[in-house]
A protein has these predicted regions:
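Structural motif
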Residues: 21, 112-116, 147, 183-184
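A residue-level signal for conserved active-site and pocket-lining positions in enzyme catalytic cores
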Residues: 55, 113, 150, 184, ...
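Catalytic-core regions built around general acid/base machinery
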Residues: 130-143
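C-terminal and late-domain segments of enzyme folds
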Residues: 18-50, 60-62, 66-76, 162, ...
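Portal/gating segments that form or line small-molecule/metal binding sites
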Residues: 62-128
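Short, Lys/Arg-enriched N-terminal segments with co-localized hydrophobic residues
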Residues: 2-16
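Catalytic nucleophile loop
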Residues: 114-117, 140-159
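Alpha-helix C-terminal capping/helix-to-coil transition sites in glycosyltransferase folds
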Residues: 108-109, 142, 179
Length: 273
C-alpha cells in the first residue's frame, strides 16, 4: 500500500533527538507505569543515563493527583514517579521542576527531561508561563533524552489540538514543542457502536473528534496511539513499540493501520510507505 504523507509545515528532524513518546502511563488493573517500565529502562540504558544523572520532571499536567489540588498535587505526582524511577531503575537525582525558582536553568542543566500526563491544557499553560516550551525544545533538539506519556506525548507535537482533555485553563498559545511534524492522539480508542447503543450514548466518538480536527487542518497527520504503545525517535529514525497497532489518519484518505515494532520513520519527513 502506498500512503503519501503531506505536512502543513516542515520540521527538520535532528538526528541527535532522543524521544520516548508513550500513549499511557498505566494499563487497567496494573500498578503505575508497570507496562512501560521495560521500555523506559531500555531507553535510559540506551542513552547512557546513570544513577546520578540529573532527571527533571515536569508535573504541571497533574492538577488533581491523589485528590490534592495543585500545587500540592505536584508534590504527590513527583513522589509517585520518583518512587518508580528509584525502585525500578535506581535513579537518585530526580527532581520536579516546580521546586526550582529558575525553572529554565533547571531544564538547561538536565540530563533527561520527563513530562508526565494529566490535563494537557494546564500543562501547556504552565510551560508557556515559565518559558519551558522553548527551553525543553532546545534541549531535546540538542539530544537530551525526552520521555513523555499521555499529555507529555501530546506536547511533543506541533500543537495540543488532538488532546482528549477538557480546556480547564486557557494557555497563552496552543503551540507546543514541535519535535515531531504530526499530531498524536494518546489513549486512542476505537469506535464501539454496540457499546454506545447499549449505554444509549449519543455523543461523538474519538474518531469523530479527530475527523473534526482534520477537516479544519487538512494538511496535518494524526497518529492514534493505542494503550500500551509508544514511539521511539533515535538517530533520525522512529519505531512503533508495544503490542498493538497504530492508526494513521489524514484528511480525505483511508486510515492506515501499522503493525507494532515497525519502522515508521516516514512520518518524520513525508516519505512514502
Amino acid at each position: 500500500m502506498i500512503f503519501l504523507i503531506i505536512f502543513a509545515s516542515t520540521i527538520i528532524i535532528e538526528k541527535t533527538m532522543r524521544l520516548l513518546l508513550i500513549s499511557n502511563s498505566t494499563n487497567f488493573g496494573e500498578t503505575y507505569l508497570a507496562w512501560a517500565c521495560n521500555q523506559i529502562e531500555f531507553f535510559c540504558l540506551q542513552n547512557n543515563l546513570k544513577k546520578d544523572s540529573r532527571i527533571v520532571f515536569v508535573p504541571f499536567a497533574g492538577v488533581n493527583i491523589a485528590g490534592k489540588a495543585y500545587p500540592e498535587s505536584y508534590d504527590a505526582y513527583e513522589a509517585r514517579v520518583q518512587k518508580v524511577f528509584f525502585e525500578k531503575f535506581g535513579f537518585e537525582n530526580f527532581t520536579s521542576v516546580h521546586h526550582f525558582e529558575d525553572k529554565v536553568k533547571a531544564v538547561k542543566e538536565a540530563d533527561c527531561i520527563i513530562v508526565g500526563g494529566g490535563n494537557t491544557f494546564h500543562l501547556v499553560a504552565e510551560m508557556h508561563k515559565y518559558g519551558l516550551m522553548d527551553a525543553i525544545r532546545e534541549r531535546a533538539l540538542a539530544g537530551v533524552p525526552y520521555i513523555g506519556w499521555s499529555a507529555g506525548s501530546n506536547v511533543a507535537c506541533p500543537t495540543l489540538c488532538t488532546t482528549n482533555d477538557m480546556p480547564i485553563v486557557q494557555p497563552a498559545s496552543f503551540k507546543t514543542l514541535n519535535l515531531v511534524p504530526f499530531q498524536i492522539n494518546p489513549h486512542y480508542l476505537d469506535p464501539h457502536p454496540e457499546i454506545d447503543k447499549m449505554i444509549k450514548h449519543g455523543g461523538e466518538t474519538r474518531q469523530d473528534r479527530i475527523n473534526e480536527y482534520l477537516a479544519v487542518n487538512q494538511q496535518m497527520v494524526v497518529v492514534g496511539l493505542r494503550e500500551a504503545t509508544s514511539l521511539w525517535v533515535t538517530d533520525g529514525k522512529m519505531m512503533l513499540k508495544g503490542g498493538k497497532k497504530m492508526i494513521v489518519m489524514q484528511y480525505g484518505k483511508e486510515a492506515v493501520e501499522i503493525e507494532p515494532n515497525t519502522d515508521v520513520t516516514f512520518l518524520l519527513g513525508g516519505q512514502q510507505a
